[in-house]
């Protein structure tokens, strides 16, 4: 059985990809309450991802500097210790979206195989793709293991999975925050007062709304900055490509 990872990123040339990532203003998730959460790592956590079916993980392409050395860990909560719930996969194939462009449209898929076969448990389970596009004000949540310190503070990387509730930001407000940088493939979420945000190391982590994954942490202006909400990949815009890719690798 293969585990396949599908990677997407929508960014802008002057934006800051959130490679080191963080959840600012969040709290520890209930253990294994996000069974779809994946940790991408090179022996240490580097980016997030999300399990979307029995063999695919979704994340953002800018996380994969050396994809063949990357491991995909499922069933994690506490990164410090072995909990007995973890299931590990390794990458063996990368497939780029035909319109790949790091500055504007960055989509990649990679397939992985392992002698360790993952199975659904209380700690490992997929989440559905969106059945609609996000609407302003929709309550959502984001999770990750990224830095929890604000800009200018000493970096603090939590070992316990962090969660945070965020609303979808109105498209007009999103475009005002990032003039000429927001495309139809992006969606903003967060608080305009800068009180809560996802950031670097949380890249690729899922934005979950109404039990479906609506977006992936992508980029932003700093972290938890007033008037600059987080920018996410808008997954509803990529459903056709995702479905075609999954069909090509049954």
UniProtKB/Swiss-Prot annotation:
The keyword Transmembrane helix belongs to this UniProt entry's keyword annotation: no
Disulfide partners: 29-163, 47-63, 133-236, 140-209, 174-188, 199-223
Signal sequence interval, chain numbering: 1-15
PROSITE patterns (alphabetical): TRYPSIN_DOM (PS50240), TRYPSIN_SER (PS00135)
Domain Peptidase S1: 23-247
Top-level division of the source organism's lineage: Eukaryota
SMART domains: Tryp_SPc
InterPro entries given in the database record: Peptidase_S1_PA (IPR009003), Peptidase_S1_PA_chymotrypsin (IPR043504), Peptidase_S1A (IPR001314), Serine_Proteases_S1 (IPR050127), Trypsin_dom (IPR001254), TRYPSIN_SER (IPR033116)
Keywords from the UniProt entry: Disulfide bond, Hydrolase, Protease, Secreted, Serine protease, Signal, Zymogen
Residues flagged as site, Required for specificity: 197
CDD domains reported for this sequence: Tryp_SPc
Enzyme class (EC, first level): hydrolase
UniProt EC number: 3.4.21.4
Residue numbers annotated as active site: 62 (charge relay system), 106 (charge relay system), 203 (charge relay system)
Propeptide section residues: 16-22
GO biological process, one term: proteolysis
Statement: the UniProt record of this protein carries the keyword Glycoprotein: no
Stated family: Belongs to the peptidase S1 family.
Protein name in UniProt: Trypsin
UniProt source species: Pleuronectes platessa (European plaice)
């Amino acid at each position: 059985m293969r585990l396949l990872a599908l990677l997407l990123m929508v960014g802008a040339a002057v934006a800051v990809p959130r490679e080191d990532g963080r959840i600012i203003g969040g709290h520890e998730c209930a253990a294994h309450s996000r069974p779809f959460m994946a940790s991408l790592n090179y022996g240490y956590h580097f980016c997030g991802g999300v399990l979307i079916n029995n063999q695919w993980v979704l994340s953002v392409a800018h996380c994969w500097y050396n994809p063949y050395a990357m491991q995909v860990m499922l069933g994690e909560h506490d990164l410090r210790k072995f909990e007995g719930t973890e299931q590990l996969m390794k990458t063996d194939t990368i497939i780029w979206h035909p319109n790949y462009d790091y500055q504007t449209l960055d989509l990649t898929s990679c397939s992985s195989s392992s002698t360790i076969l993952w199975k659904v448990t209380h700690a490992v389970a997929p989440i559905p793709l969106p059945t609609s596009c996000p609407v302003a004000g929709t309550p959502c949540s984001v999770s990750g293991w990224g830095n929890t310190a604000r800009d200018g503070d000493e970096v603090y990387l939590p070992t316990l999975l962090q969660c945070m509730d965020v609303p979808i930001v109105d498209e007009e407000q999103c475009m005002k925050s990032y003039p000429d940088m927001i495309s139809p493939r992006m969606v903003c979420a967060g608080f305009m007062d800068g009180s809560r945000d996802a950031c670097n190391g949380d890249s690729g982590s899922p934005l979950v709304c109404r039990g479906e994954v609506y977006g992936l942490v992508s980029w932003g202006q700093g972290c938890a900055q007033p008037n600059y909400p987080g920018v996410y990949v808008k997954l509803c815009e990529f459903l056709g490509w995702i479905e075609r890719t999954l069909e090509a690798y049954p």
